[in-house]
C-alpha cells in the first residue's frame, strides 16, 4: 500500500537542475542529475554477462541505444507515455531508462509492502513497444534514510540490507517480464549522495544490492550508478569518475558489478573534443585506466545519460532563428556522440537524455520541445544509430 507521492520537486531532476544552471550559464550543457544480457563483458564480470558487442571496423562497436526519461513516464498519462515511447522506437533504441525511486513505492514504512502499480504501467508499455527497461534504483523514503539525514532523497539508506531487499523484490517481480537491467543509484560521486560522496559506503550498497538481485534473477545485469562528469566547482562535493571507480574498486564494490555507468555531456557539437568524453580513455587519469588498475580492464561502460541542450528556449529574448541554430547544433552533437562513443574503448551503450523539455525544471535537452514539436536531433539520432548497426 502506498499512501502518498513524495514531493517530486526534490527528486533526481533536482541535481540536473543545479548542474544545468551552472553549465548553461557557461554556454555548455548539463553534466548531472542502462544492456542486453549479452553485452561486452570483461575481467571480473559476474555471472549472467557474456560478450557480444565487438569492434566492427571503422564504425567501431555496435552499441546498445536507449532513451532516458528519469521519472516522467512514471507519472505520465497513457497517451503521453505512448507518444514518448514511440520516440524511442523512432530513434532506434532498444532500451529506456527509468527511475525506480524507492520512496515512490514504499513511502510509509516497512510494514506495508511496496505498491509497484505505477512501474507496472511503464514496464508493460515498454514491452508493448518492443523496448527493454533499465531501472535506476535509488531515493530511499524518509523512514529508510540514514539517521540525521532525512530532508533530501539524496540521503543514503540507513540499512544496505533493507535497500537490497527492496531491489530484490522489484527484480523478482520484473524478471519474468523481461527486466534484468539495474543501475544502483544515480551519480553517487556528487551531491546526489548526501552530504558528500562516500565511495566505501557506496561500494557496500552496490555489493549488497547486486547480490540480492542476482539471488532472484540469474540473468540480472547490475551497473555501478551513473557517474557524473562535470568539473568540480566551489561549494559542490565532487569526486571524479576515475577516482570514484578506483576507490570503489579498492573497497571491493566492482566485484559484483557487470558494468559502470557514466554521464558525459560534451557541451559542443564535436563530442570527440570534449573533456567529458576524453575522461573515458583519453585523459591522463581516465576511467579505463582506473578500471584496469582495479583489475577490470574490459568492464563495459554504459553511457546512461548524455545529450545536448537548447538553452535559448529559457531566454525570452532569444530569436526563433537563434533557437533553430541551437537545435541544429544539438542534432550535430547527437550524430557526433554516436560516432565518437562507438570508437571509444569499453563503451557498450549510449542513452540520450531526454525525450521532451521540462521548462519548469530548466531542462531543455529534449528530442521534443515542451509543446511537443519534434526537433532535428531525433532524426539525426535515428540516422546515426541506423548507420552504427550496419
Residue map of PLM features:
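Terminal targeting segments of Actinobacterial cell-envelope proteins
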Residues: 1-12
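Aromatic-rich peripheral "rim/lid" segments of glycoside hydrolase catalytic domains that contact
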Residues: 2-4, 55, 188, 313-390
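Secretory targeting and sorting signals
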Residues: 10-34
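Boundary/entry segment of secreted carbohydrate-active catalytic domains
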Residues: 44, 48-95, 99-101
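Noncatalytic carbohydrate-binding groove/subsite architecture in carbohydrate-active enzymes
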Residues: 60, 78, 160, 164, ...
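Short acidic/polar active-site loop segments enriched in Thr and Asp
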Residues: 65, 94, 177-180, 258, ...
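A general structural detector for well-ordered alpha-helical segments in enzyme core domains, enriched
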Residues: 83-88, 115-125, 166-170, 201-209, ...
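Substrate-binding cleft and catalytic face of glycoside hydrolase catalytic domains
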Residues: 91-236, 267, 297, 308, ...
Amino acid at each position: 500500500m502506498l499512501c502518498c507521492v513524495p514531493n517530486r520537486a526534490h527528486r533526481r531532476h533536482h541535481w540536473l537542475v543545479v548542474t544545468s544552471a551552472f553549465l548553461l550559464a557557461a554556454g555548455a550543457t548539463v553534466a548531472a542529475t542502462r544492456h542486453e544480457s549479452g553485452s561486452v563483458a570483461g575481467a571480473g564480470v559476474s555471472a549472467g554477462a557474456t560478450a557480444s558487442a565487438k569492434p566492427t571496423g571503422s564504425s567501431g562497436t555496435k552499441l546498445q541505444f536507449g532513451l532516458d526519461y528519469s521519472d516522467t513516464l512514471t507519472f505520465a498519462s497513457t497517451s503521453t507515455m505512448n507518444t514518448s515511447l514511440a520516440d524511442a522506437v523512432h530513434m532506434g533504441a532498444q532500451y529506456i531508462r527509468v527511475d525506480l525511486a524507492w520512496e515512490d513505492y514504499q513511502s510509509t514504512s516497512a510494514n506495508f509492502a511496496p505498491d509497484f502499480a505505477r512501474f507496472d504501467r511503464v514496464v508493460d508499455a515498454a514491452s508493448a513497444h518492443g523496448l527493454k527497461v533499465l531501472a535506476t534504483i535509488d531515493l530511499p523514503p524518509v523512514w529508510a534514510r540514514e539517521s540525521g539525514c532525512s530532508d533530501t532523497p539524496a540521503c543514503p539508506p540507513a540499512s544496505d540490507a533493507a535497500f537490497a531487499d527492496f531491489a530484490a523484490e522489484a527484480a523478482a517481480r520484473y524478471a519474468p517480464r523481461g527486466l534484468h537491467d539495474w543501475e544502483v543509484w544515480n551519480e553517487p560521486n556528487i551531491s546526489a549522495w548526501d552530504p558528500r560522496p562516500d565511495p566505501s559506503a557506496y561500494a557496500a550498497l552496490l555489493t549488497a544490492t547486486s547480490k540480492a538481485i542476482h539471488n532472484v534473477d540469474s540473468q540480472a545485469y547490475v551497473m555501478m550508478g551513473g557517474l557524473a562528469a562535470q568539473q568540480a566547482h566551489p561549494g559542490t562535493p565532487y569526486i571524479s569518475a576515475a577516482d570514484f571507480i578506483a576507490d570503489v574498486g579498492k573497497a571491493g564494490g566492482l566485484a559484483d558489478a557487470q558494468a559502470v555507468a557514466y554521464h558525459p555531456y560534451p557541451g559542443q557539437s564535436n563530442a570527440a573534443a570534449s573533456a567529458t568524453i576524453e575522461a573515458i580513455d583519453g585523459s591522463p587519469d581516465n576511467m579505463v585506466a582506473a578500471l584496469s588498475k582495479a583489475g577490470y580492464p574490459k568492464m563495459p561502460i554504459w553511457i546512461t545519460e548524455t545529450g545536448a541542450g537548447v538553452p535559448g528556449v529559457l531566454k525570452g529574448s532569444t530569436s526563433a532563428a537563434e533557437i533553430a541554430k541551437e537545435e541544429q547544433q544539438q542534432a550535430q552533437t547527437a550524430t557526433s556522440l554516436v560516432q565518437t562513443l562507438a570508437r571509444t574503448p569499453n563503451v557498450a551503450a549510449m542513452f540520450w537524455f531526454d525525450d521532451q523539455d521540462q521548462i519548469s525544471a530548466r531542462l531543455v535537452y529534449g528530442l521534443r520541445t515542451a509543446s511537443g514539436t519534434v526537433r532535428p536531433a531525433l532524426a539525426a539520432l535515428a540516422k546515426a544509430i541506423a548507420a552504427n548497426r550496419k
